[in-house]
Amino acid sequence: MEKPSREAFEGNNKLLIGIVLSVITFWLFAQSLVNVVPILEDSFNTDIGTVNIAVSITALFSGMFVVGAGGLADKYGRIKLTNIGIILNILGSLLIIISNIPLLLIIGRLIQGLSAACIMPATLSIIKSYYIGKDRQRALSYWSIGSWGGSGVCSFFGGAVATLLGWRWIFILSIIISLIALFLIKGTPETKSKSISLNKFDIKGLVLLVIMLLSLNILITKGSELGVTSLLFITLLAIAIGSFSLFIVLEKRATNPLIDFKLFKNKAYTGATASNFLLNGVAGTLIVANTFVQRGLGYSSLQAGSLSITYLVMVLIMIRVGEKLLQTLGCKKPMLIGTGVLIVGECLISLTFLPEIFYVICCIIGYLFFGLGLGIYATPSTDTAIANAPLEKVGVAAGIYKMASALGGAFGVALSGAVYAIVSNMTNIYTGAMIALWLNAGMGILSFVIILLLVPKQNDTQL
């Protein structure tokens, strides 16, 4: 077993602030492009398809590599991987802002995805190592403020910065925040697992995972254009299924697998991770709702982002409330309450058939419930996943949990956008938005069922 270095060092506020700042480089800054797509089209003189690739590729690459990065953090050092992630974000941000070349935009966004893959599992592992009991729950609350809170603020933040300062300032500010995070984390003792032998990295598993996820993403985003009977669609589907099947077989046989499926023998961990995937999938709500009010109601990006102010306020307030509910009620009840409230919010935002003034009111209230629900859910879910991971595997476990976050967001956005486009072309944008938002509500309902069935009433059983 790993000897926790927290015996010699205890986490403090300086380290925690550095961790939170590193986390928001992805969840706040990198995700802010979700509300500035038309501006990027003009700035880079390119089409919406290219911009959509740039917007989604960050979360996709984060999800593909986050598990591998979690394993590297366990082996070679969590502080080291965090610092590498922060430096990668600076590099990616520079590539994005130095020119108007679309290729550099995509490469920069790809590098930001790798940055997030390093930062997320490594920082969760640092919290596991250096914070104990209520201090750990407090640290996870602030970590959740950086992730869930950042995702809540990103739509309004991106629209506001792009309108008032110019979109490049999103990444200039991200570079400044990254430098501050590096300074605050500097001097923290390294923490790594001593029980994992430095075996050869699972390259085969990583390659298969990348092939599977890229194929699946293309099927979702381009499926309607390709046609389900086309040779390319069928080929991609076969590649996705084949690579997934081979990945499962190889990972179960590997001595040092990329994903340790033994972690999923714990129902609490499985429930937290699966529900986390689905509730991050409802990020598609922001894409659909923002696009609808801009195209259907004629709103600007700043006006569209302003509708979600209640979301960002509530998610920031309720994350600490979720922490207190975790301490008093255990993990299951807050996760169920949060998910249930979120579903109500989704239903309100989906009422696109209403007159404009009534729909705006429903949006404001719906986003309030949306943020309230996610805020209550965030800390209990994260704590459930981390608390049920063995210390020597916490980096990999955190990596899988955050892979669920990133891939849930990436595929939720892709699937919601695809449904919105298909139904809108068949009917109108009002119906298209409503059906796409119902899809997000459905993911919330499925998440509720998973929590109900898998997460125990008292989270006291650990691997």
UniProtKB/Swiss-Prot annotation:
Stretches that traverse the bilayer: 17-37, 53-73, 86-106, 107-127, 142-162, 165-185, 201-221, 230-250, 273-293, 299-319, 334-354, 357-377, 403-423, 435-455
Regulation: induction: Down-regulated by MgrA. Up-regulated by NorG.
Membrane topology of the entry: Multi-pass membrane protein
A GO-annotated cellular component: plasma membrane
A Gene Ontology biological process term: transmembrane transport
Location in the cell: Cell membrane
Gene Ontology MF term list: transmembrane transporter activity
Function: Multidrug efflux pump that acts independently of NorA and is one of the factors that confers resistance against diverse quinolones and chemical compounds. Extrudes norfloxacin, ciprofloxacin, cetrimide, tetraphenylphosphonium ion (TPP), sparfloxacin, moxifloxacin and ethidium bromide. Also contributes to the efflux of tetracycline.
Protein name in the entry: Quinolone resistance protein NorB
Lineage: Bacteria, Bacillati, Bacillota, Bacilli, Bacillales
GN (gene name): norB
